[in-house]
Regions:
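Conserved phosphoryl-transfer catalytic core
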Residues: 1-6, 165-167
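Helicase P-loop NTPase motor core
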Residues: 5-98, 121-125, 157, 179, ...
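Short secondary-structure transition/capping segments
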Residues: 14, 112-115
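Conserved helicase C-terminal RecA-like lobe
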Residues: 71, 85-97, 110, 117-284
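Generic beta-strand/beta-sheet core signal
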Residues: 78-80, 102, 282-284
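Conserved RecA-like helicase motor-core motifs
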Residues: 96-106
Length: 284
């Protein structure tokens, strides 16, 4: 039994789909059709890279909205992998276009992205207690909640940052056998701080990924989810490279602080209200 009638698409869309699927030699013969009108013709465009693609797509949505030919909720951007959402999200934000990711999480809210950004934040400014606490056991270092609590209590008592308390962990009451693990973390962060003086942002990020074994651990899991997370990390690396290229083109210095400031502008975006007019972003 072949289910060939389509009730939602236009015939032009189905004709294009038929043309693409026809090249699959292992498929069973099937031709999709509809009683709907032919609809608008499909426009096919190729771009040199993802940046040009996202800029054109979002620019086209903005133009249609500006001209009154489409509302935001009439528009959707479909892509193959979650990692591709980052460019479309950023372009939408720059164009002040509301959007909603369907069936996924905003790029900068994904666990692996937040973990690695917190490493960069800690290297840049170890007084960021939230960032330091997030990565203290990423990867797992065997520093338990009780130890973390004692260190935080000491930091509060001495009115110092959590990281400064880590640096003098030997003075924390009842720190016990966790001291060597805490010292190992501090030594690691201090080495990254030293390297940050000579490394570019992208080099520093790749060094963190390499030394923590973050991607190696994900690859060892070898699941669909872990592979998607590796793609997200690759996309974050691409973002650092893009930032450096932009700064170079503008004859400005690419700094870790500058990169984190740029990310901060787009990372803390509240979710779109369900009743608002927004563009839909989603994977196929």
């Amino acid at each position: 039994i072949r289910l060939e009638q389509n009730y939602r698409s236009t015939q032009n869309i189905l004709n294009a789909a038929n043309g693409v699927i026809a090249n699959n030699t292992e498929r069973k013969e099937k031709t999709l059709w509809t009683e709907n009108p032919e609809g608008e013709k499909i426009h096919f465009r190729q771009f040199m890279n993802g940046y040009e693609e996202a800029e054109f797509v979002v620019g086209d949505i903005a133009r249609r909205h500006r001209e009154g030919t489409a509302e935001y909720h009439n528009c959707a951007v479909l892509y193959r992998t979650n990692a591709q959402s980052r460019l479309f999200e950023e372009k939408c934000l720059l164009a002040n276009i509301p959007y909603k990711i369907v069936g996924g999480v905003n790029f900068y809210a994904r666990k692996e992205i937040k973990d690695l950004l917190c490493y960069l934040k800690t290297v840049d400014n170890a007084a960021d207690d939230l960032a330091v606490r997030r990565i203290l056991n990423v990867p797992k270092r065997g520093i338990g909640a009780t130890t973390v609590g004692r260190i935080q209590d000491y930091a509060d008592m001495m009115n110092i940052s959590f990281y400064d308390a880590l640096r003098v962990a030997e003075e924390v009451p009842s720190i016990g056998r966790s001291l060597s693990k805490v010292d190992g973390f501090v030594t690691f962060i201090q080495s990254l701080k030293s390297k940050a003086q000579a490394y570019s942002v992208s080099e520093l990020l790749e060094e963190i990924i390499d030394l923590t074994g973050y991607v190696d651990e994900l690859k060892a899991e070898d699941t669909e989810e872990s592979r998607a997370r590796v793609e997200n990390i690759d996309e974050l690396i691409s973002k650092t490279v893009s930032y450096e290229e932009t700064m170079k083109a503008e004859n400005r210095e690419a700094t870790l602080s500058g990169f984190l400031e740029e990310i901060a502008l787009i990372a803390d975006i509240d979710s779109v209200d369900e009743n608002q007019d927004y563009v839909v972003l989603m994977t196929l």
